[in-house]
Amino acid sequence: MSGKVANATPKAAAGKPRLSAAGGGAYRRTSSGPLPSAGGGGGRASSESGVSSRVRVAVRLRPRNADELAADADFGDCVELQPELKRLKLRKNNWESETYEFDEVLTEFASQKRVYEVVAKPVVESVLEGYNGTVMAYGQTGTGKTFTLGRLGEEDTAARGIMVRAMEDILADITPETDTVSVSYLQLYMEMIQDLLDPVNDNIAIVEDPRTGDVSLPGATVVEVRDQKSFVDLLRIGEAHRVAANTKLNTESSRSHALLMVNVRRAVKGKHEMDVSISGENGHSSSMVGSLRPPIVRKSKLVVVDLAGSERIDKSGSEGHTLEEAKSINLSLSALGKCINALAENSPHVPVRDSKLTRLLKDSFGGTARTSLVVTIGPSPRHRGETTSTIMFGQRAMKVENMVKLKEEFDYKSLCRRLDIELDKLIAENERQRKYFDDEIERITAEAQLRVTEAEREYKISLENEKAKYHQEYLDSIKILEEKWKIHQQSPKKLIKETEPTSSEVGEVQNLLQNEKVLRQSAEDEANDLKNQVLHWKKMEAAATAEVVKLRKMLDTEASQKEKLDEEIAVLKSQLLQLSLDADETRRSLDRGDGSGKIFPGFDSLMSHSRNSQPREQSNGPKPPIAKLFEQVGLQKILSLLESEEPDVRVHAVKVVANLAAEEANQEKIVEAGGLTSLLMLLRSSEDETIRRVAAGAIANLAMNETNQDLIMAQGGVSLLSMTASDAEDPQTLRMVAGAIANLCGNDKLQTRLRGEGGIKALLGMVKCGHPDVLAQVARGIANFAKCESRAATQGNKVGKSLLIDDGALPWIVKNANNEAAPIRRHIELALCHLAQHEVNSKDIISEGALWELVRISRDCSREDIRMLAYRTLTSSPTLQSEMRRLRIEC
């Protein structure tokens, strides 16, 4: 990609919205609305209302790389761009395609400058005006996300990414004397937030304000940036510490999500000023002109997010620790996708707490930030699925609405510094005024002292005169009072003598009245107690009567339910017995070879081609007895009979479950109801050969489903099947066990675990039986295992010798390659061809004599597909060709 260096954006007046400097394809930024009023108290002046702003999404196509030019030379691109219509066509095949519209479509020839002006510049301008902004890149591994965002452009200035160009515009627009720009550079690696500028700080905690919901990282390193060179040096340091790995899709695949946080703090000029004048008594005055209101600053944040690429394990070839990294990346991207879906569908609940990535991007999607998303895709048709997923992510993101808000705060620090200067001036002025006041006070104090002394002398003379006058009046009043007291002293004695008899009578009456009151109160209390006791006993009697009636009703109900359950159990036992007899009769008919009637599905399902060849019943025909029982009784009751203490009931129940498991429609219901766990428990605990045989057959039927195969492995099914095979003597039991293991051998994901838990050795151990049916199932299992190994080796997912050869299966394969039984011979021939396809097995093929069998198969095999496979294997293997030339063998 090429392009000229982006010109610095000229400064714009604060508070005025600006248009994007991009060309005709760039979109116009929505109006930010009027600035909030600076009036009112408090420490925050942020706007409470916001402007709705949709997430803007652009798609960028990466040109073909060298590998794609070589591998896809005969194929066209899977995408077709229509940039003039802002549309993208995704081809499903040569005839069908789907069209998607985006805010901008960038071809593989789009320059870095063009990408910046379309995607990031409107967001950067919003950040300079005081709004939060987010620029994010999303896409598959190796599609150019880091190139788009984090390219430093040291060798080619035209290749500079969004991070470098955004900082150039920010530094060009701010005023260094009043504005500040600070940077933090982080990575989210394995769900841990690590500081790329300080690698020691490798587990930073996320702090969420409980009042506003804002997310912050107080432990992250924050570096103030003054010039572009220091910012580029910081990016270089951060990129050196970022985790990367070599995968099949990208030699320098980022294994973490990188977040560049740019905090911009700008002062807003105001005119809130007031004159304050201070005057002294002597006429001197000092005036202070300043703003009593703190200055307003706008704080905004630009977040540039370089997401790690989503990848499929089978395509990237991740393994070991790289596999764990890929799992963590996919989990966090999955959580982000869930949040985008919830926001796009206006869901009441958005699961932002499912991942640290979604918590960090909480403000970017559905929050208050202006967000631009660039989705990067590749042209290769091999990655059509990943390209489709990326495009659909961008389509859903376009439905997300953010409420953009302007954040202004009072700058109390600046106000404090200015007030400190004013305070120093006032202190000096105060000292001058204080000296003047002290001198004036001394003069006034001296004058006042003289006046006080004269007033005290005059007051003292007046006080003496008044004192003498009042003393004489006091003596006269005392004499008058003494005379009145003597007169009144004689009157009370006469009054006491007259009132003594009356006082004694009143006292006796009062005592009698008091006693009567006490007796009356006691009687009333006793009567109330008796009433309460009578009421209490009446309530208890009524409650006891109601309880007796209730218990009688419950007893009658329980008795009737017991009778119904006994009758139902008797009916179920008779139905199970009849069905078991029918199944046994059918099985005996099958053993006799008459071929009439429907064979026992549980055992027949071991051979998938036989089961598929049976004609299905007509929808209007009568249902089989098993289906009728399943509808009438219910699966849960049938499974509960597996734990019956009566052996006959348990045998019949497991046969019914085995027949139900033969139908694919019933398998999911059996597993959900716990049937698989119950069957494995029977293998573990039962000593009855019949129960273990039928249980193994039911497990074999369930093992036809890939989901059930994972559950069987997770619950130790292979170990239980191996143990059953070692204890069994009946060939039919061994046939069922071998069939179950053979079905598990057909799963690519389970091969290592299957071998580790003894599955292959259990198969080889069952060949001692010698029964043709058992040998046919063993041969089928070995053929399935060899086919999966061959497919994995072809895809590059497996190296090294075959696990079958390591476990000693090759001698038995060679020995039975020309078996008289057609099913055994067909599976053995197929297994031998798949083993020989992997070059690393060639020496063992030769040493065990399997080369002659391959030559025989290529000449005499009755099936043309196996014969051609053997021929291609012999002609494509250099080792086998060399040995054939040595032995003078011709194909």
UniProtKB/Swiss-Prot annotation:
Organism expressing this protein natively: Oryza sativa subsp. japonica
Biased composition (Basic and acidic residues): 586-595
Gene3D superfamilies (UniProt xref): Kinesin motor domain, Leucine-rich Repeat Variant
Subcellular location: Cytoplasm, Cytoskeleton
Pfam families per UniProt: Arm, Kinesin
Motif (D-BOX): 370-378
UniProt feature, compositional bias: Polar residues: 607-621
GO biological process, one term: microtubule-based movement
Protein name: Kinesin-like protein KIN-UB
ARM repeat extents: 623-662, 664-704, 706-746, 748-787
Single GO term (MF): microtubule binding
InterPro entries xref list: ARM-like (IPR011989), ARM-type_fold (IPR016024), Armadillo (IPR000225), KIF11-like (IPR047149), Kinesin_motor_CS (IPR019821), Kinesin_motor_dom (IPR001752), Kinesin_motor_dom_sf (IPR036961), P-loop_NTPase (IPR027417)
Biased composition annotated in UniProt, kind: Low complexity: 45-54
Stretches the record annotates as Disordered: 1-54, 586-626
Gene encoding the protein: KINUB
Domain Kinesin motor: 54-400
